[in-house]
């Protein structure tokens, strides 16, 4: 596993952000804290095998076993009971986080059909970025022949940045393709 993005962060991105935002200390420079990959499988209410396949796909993508998420409330219209398994999520930190980000930016996002860049409006006001992916087959680890259903996922990139501008410049330096 290469930590090329970690090396890039330490050698190129930190000095550039220090000069751009006039930080007093290198420790003030925003950094990636974690990446959360969440896959909601609403159909798991009626067919629990779908959840197993989602867990398997997330394990392939991230190299880490996902946590199964459960419903917080019962909703009768969706035939959903409290405590029922309805999704899976993985929290990536450290080298696995940098490896996943590198794979996302350089391999997966360019494989999206009609891709013109990701929205720059998906920041939450505290320096975190949320990205929705409509199909899991953009990742090279997923074998298209073995996919029984195209599922989307949410990718949340949590940074230590105080503002959205700092977080955007951090992600831009990592090569995130924002829309112009």
From Swiss-Prot:
* Family label: Belongs to the universal ribosomal protein uL5 family.
Biological role stated in the UniProt entry: This is one of the proteins that bind and probably mediate the attachment of the 5S RNA into the large ribosomal subunit, where it forms part of the central protuberance. In the 70S ribosome it contacts protein S13 of the 30S subunit (bridge B1b), connecting the 2 subunits; this bridge is implicated in subunit movement. Contacts the P site tRNA; the 5S rRNA and some of its associated proteins might help stabilize positioning of ribosome-bound tRNAs.
Question: Which InterPro entries has this protein been placed in?
Answer: Ribosomal_uL5, Ribosomal_uL5_bac-type, Ribosomal_uL5_C, Ribosomal_uL5_CS, Ribosomal_uL5_dom_sf, Ribosomal_uL5_N
Instruction: Name the source organism.
Output: Acholeplasma laidlawii (strain PG-8A)
Name of the featured protein: Large ribosomal subunit protein uL5
Q: Which GO terms describe its biological process?
A: translation
GO cellular component labels: ribonucleoprotein complex; ribosome
Pfam annotation, one family: Ribosomal_L5_C
Arranged from A to Z, the UniProt key words for this protein are:
Ribonucleoprotein, Ribosomal protein, RNA-binding, rRNA-binding, tRNA-binding
Provide the GO MF annotations for this entry: rRNA binding; structural constituent of ribosome; tRNA binding
Show the SUPFAM superfamilies listed in the entry: RL5-like (SSF55282)
Would the keyword rRNA processing turn up in this protein's UniProt record? Answer: no
Gene expressing this chain: rplE
What does the annotation say about its assembly with partners? Part of the 50S ribosomal subunit; part of the 5S rRNA/L5/L18/L25 subcomplex. Contacts the 5S rRNA and the P site tRNA. Forms a bridge to the 30S subunit in the 70S ribosome.
């Amino acid at each position: 596993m290469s930590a090329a993005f970690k090396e890039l962060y330490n050698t190129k991105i930190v000095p550039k952000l220090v000069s751009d935002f006039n930080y007093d200390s290198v420790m003030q420079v925003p950094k990636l804290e974690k990446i959360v990959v969440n896959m909601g499988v609403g159909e798991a209410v009626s067919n629990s095998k779908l959840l197993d396949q989602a867990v398997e796909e997330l394990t392939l993508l991230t190299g880490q076993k996902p946590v199964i998420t459960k419903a917080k409330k019962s909703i009768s219209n969706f035939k959903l009971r409290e405590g029922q398994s309805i999704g899976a999520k993985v929290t990536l930190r450290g080298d696995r986080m940098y490896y996943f980000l590198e794979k996302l930016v350089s391999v997966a996002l360019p494989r999206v059909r009609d891709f013109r860049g990701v929205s720059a409006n998906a920041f939450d006001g505290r320096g975190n970025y949320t990205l929705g992916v409509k199909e899991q087959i953009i990742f090279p680890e997923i074998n298209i022949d073995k996919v029984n259903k195209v599922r989307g996922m949410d990718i949340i990139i949590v940074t230590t940045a105080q503002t959205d501008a700092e977080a955007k410049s951090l992600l831009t330096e990592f090569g995130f393709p924002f829309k112009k």
